[in-house]
């Protein structure tokens, strides 16, 4: 039998991992109602991960839209490094996203190398990545982490997509203290051509990519400590 190499890396072409430890985990329904559901999962020690976390996420439909509340509790005996990110895709119709107006209230972005590993922060001033004023996305390809995000009076930042002709609007909001980062991904590199540029992923994140190595905005949960912070999607 020919030799095989088995790797647990989820991004083997770039030599690192992506999308966290529970993307493919099995979640169970804890509570369910007509307008809400709570799912739970226990993250056990495994290769490359030595801590125990109880995880839950509640999805609730309200009059204003969808509210998502993730929660993580350290049920182990040692402090656990932790970071959370979600990966929702937004659209305002069936048109390509390059025909959509985008607003991102962020003053800085994370510069990366050819493996998409962080190399430093840069201001968005005078770049084509500055969306602090709404404008058409056009042909710009984004797979970009933003920070220095400006919050509204309620303490949340908001990223908005608007269709300039139909008037459709969708907004993703997140608690700015809990989520000082967001990733914006236009999907141009997705393997299925039909999915490319059909929506924009707006990803609220507690820390930037590679935070377990850099320590940047990495949370550390003491035994018994819990993280919980909402984000949501509001249609216009």
Question: What name fits each language-model region?
Answer:
Residues 30-37, 60-65, 94, 165, ...:
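A short, structured loop/turn motif at beta-sheet edges
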Residues 168-236:
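Active-site pocket scaffolds in enzymes
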Residues 73-77, 164, 236:
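Short solvent-exposed strand-capping/beta-turn motif centered on an Asx-Ser/Thr pair
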Residues 9-63:
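Extended, loop-rich substrate-binding clefts of extracytoplasmic carbohydrate-active enzymes
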Residues 89-177:
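Active-site/ligand-binding surface loops and adjacent short beta/alpha elements
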Residues 1-2, 222:
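Residue-level recognition of short, solvent-exposed, well-ordered loop/turn junctions
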Residues 6, 12-15, 233-236:
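Short, charged beta-turn/beta-strand-edge "cap" motif at the junction between a beta-strand
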Residues 43-88, 93:
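Acidic, contiguous internal or C-terminal segments within carbohydrate-active enzymes
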